[in-house]
Amino acid sequence: WVTDSTYIHTLKDGWTYLSTIQDLHTKKVIGWKFGKQMTKELVIETLDHALLNQTPSENLIIHSDLGSQYTSEAYEAKLNELNIRHSFSRKGCPYDNAGIESFHASLKKEEVYPSKAYENFEAAHLALFQYIEGFYNRKRIHSSINYLTPNQMEELALQA
């Protein structure tokens, strides 16, 4: 799994924060939370959401950058409790986390920037839900997974 957070601007509420977890094998966004503040609680809630959607394999590794939320004692304790190993990008090297960075770039190019501006937090939240759950996981094909959608790839992986 890979995880990161990105900024989304709204007219009324200013900067808001999207935290996501992606399964690198299927390209599926398996956990995401949207908040008005970038906190360790937001990334822990994202992890909880991912765990509702997918049971981690025995030797699961989650990769993140060195952001304070991901290096917090609370986040590390949660990962330890779940027996999930944590790997980190090198300082100042976003390429180490290219999978999730690529998802965020696609999200911004395909949804955020074309929309010009979201009126408020709620409007942004609805648009993100529609993009992630309605389009990205269900309809967006990826050449790296043989032109399947993330949901189709997940189904194949579960059958194997």
Predicted regions and their residues:
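Charged DNA-binding/catalytic regions of mobile-element recombinases
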Residues: W1-A160
